[in-house]
Amino acid sequence: MKFVDEATIKVDAGDGGNGVVSFWREKFVAKGGPDGGDGGDGGDVYLEADENLNTLIDYRFNRFYNAERGKNGSGGNCTGKRGEDITLKVPVGTRAIDIDTGEKVAELMTHGMKQMVAKGGWHGLGNTRFKSSVNRAPRQKTLGTKGEVRELRLELLLLADVGMLGLPNAGKSTFIRAVSAAKPKVADYPFTTLIPSLGVVRARGNKSFVVADIPGLIEGAADGAGLGVRFLKHLERCRVLLHVIDILPIDGSDPVQNALTIIDELEQYSEKVASKPRWLLFNKTDLLLEEEADEKINEILEALAWEDRYFKIAAVSRTGTQELCDELADFMDTLPKEIQTEEEKAANKVDFMWDDYHKDAMSGKDVVTEDDWDDWDDEEDDGHVIYVRD
């Protein structure tokens, strides 16, 4: 199945049903009190994570989704039926962004997780709600509110522990083939990898982690060159980044400049991603003598002023790959789990437009008055007497 990690959809929550103006009518009761019922709430729209899905391709062909409208109220204090909700299944790791506001509406990280993305409209109030000691025959009602309408951008972010980045043909796909059972395409031309791929790596002590391989970056990727930076989003949830550097590029380019290009593109994309722990992987060391490879690596480290961890590997022959994986597994055990701060929670809170609707309705806003009850006269309503035969 084709891998699709981004789709745009439009969701319409159901409108609320209207309240109704009605009065109690039956034999021998000519002027009963108000009995207009409320409308029903509109249906909501939800996203639910499903571990059996791994692509958003279904939402490329069907972009519009509507929840059911609430039914109107009726006489006899009958409340209208609530509209049916609609639930859209998406892969685990999907997030939803409101295109108009840019806010993150939902982020689904575990199987079965369910979040609302569009709230149904509130029900309208029937005239029974407006009766009082001074208004015994209210002709007021309120209409149901419109349901939320949102245009959402669905983004599928791979859930991986380790993310790989580098220029095309740096050896990222060869590395993931060497350390896992994943088999991404490998060839001697740029952009062999067109979509991200995942591999499960086994390390010592029965430890394991997931590594993600994304298409290569080139200079100007932040401005759309090559495949752009659209796949960098898959690194946002990674805990460690592996920056693969080809110490002997086939095109004769400078490894130092190549490394700086990747760092620059990463920083332009996101400071948060750029600040993640990042290790350098010097690949294709088997193409040079050991002394020459060490000399080349030291030159690169000095030019980058690099003081963090780095490893020398030859992915095609799997030289140094197992030691690297063991070190990665041990290092990730020392990393703290990400905990969302109160500020981040507040920033991610979604404010819906209908939160204060009922308060506004009862205060007199959006009240509709029906004047078609001319046969009713408040002045004449002094109660009525029911005669009961003994």
From Swiss-Prot:
Residues bound to Mg(2+): 173, 193
Residue ranges occupied by any Obg domain in the UniProt entry: 1-159
Alphabetic keyword roster: Cytoplasm, GTP-binding, Hydrolase, Magnesium, Metal-binding, Nucleotide-binding
Chain positions recorded as GTP binding sites: 166-173, 191-195, 213-216, 283-286, 314-316
Residue ranges of every copy of the OBG-type G domain listed in the record: 160-333
EC class: hydrolase
CDD domains per the UniProt record, alphabetical: Obg
Entry GO terms, CC: cytoplasm
Cofactor: Mg(2+)
GO biological process: ribosome biogenesis
One example GO MF annotation: GTPase activity
Localisation: Cytoplasm
Its EC number(s): 3.6.5.-
Similarity section: Belongs to the TRAFAC class OBG-HflX-like GTPase superfamily. OBG GTPase family.
Protein's job: An essential GTPase which binds GTP, GDP and possibly (p)ppGpp with moderate affinity, with high nucleotide exchange rates and a fairly low GTP hydrolysis rate. Plays a role in control of the cell cycle, stress response, ribosome biogenesis and in those bacteria that undergo differentiation, in morphogenesis control.
Record-linked NCBIfam families: Obg_CgtA, PRK12297.1, PRK12299.1
Subunit structure, as described in the record: Monomer.
Name used for this protein in its record: GTPase Obg
Organism of origin: Aliivibrio fischeri (strain ATCC 700601 / ES114) (Vibrio fischeri)
